[in-house]
Amino acid sequence: AQTAQLQDELTGALIGLARATVGDTLATEETWNVMITGLFATLTNVSFDDAAIREQIAAVHRAKDALVPQCQSCGAPCGRNDDYDLRQLWEEPDEDIRSLKSLILFGLRGMAAYAYHAMVLGYRDAAIDTFFSEALCKVGEAFPMEELLQRL
């Protein structure tokens, strides 16, 4: 149970990182590496090492802080780049929205396996990086079903 909770925390941190990349021109190759590696680590049977997952969460936070360093000292925090609490997804009362967001998330995790292995082999596609970011943001946003479907 602890590992699953850490994986949820990592996923929430990745959604926060994705939020920080939207409209930001400072995202680097390292930013995308952290995002893809983090998503890959949340796949079933990839990592049961709690210490490694905690380190991945810290790496995601460092990457986010590099993109939006002013968020740490903001006098009027807006929460825009905060980590997402995945319990909001699991406890979503609308089962259709919960199911659609879960489908998006699990699909992203599966895609991350391919993207991770491509990354290890030296291949990268900026459009794929952006897609990961935009799709993670959708999981963390509160939309009615009709609007969520339009945004996919």
Label for each model-derived stretch:
Residues 1-152:
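Metallocofactor- and cofactor-centric catalytic cores in central/energy metabolism, strongly enriched
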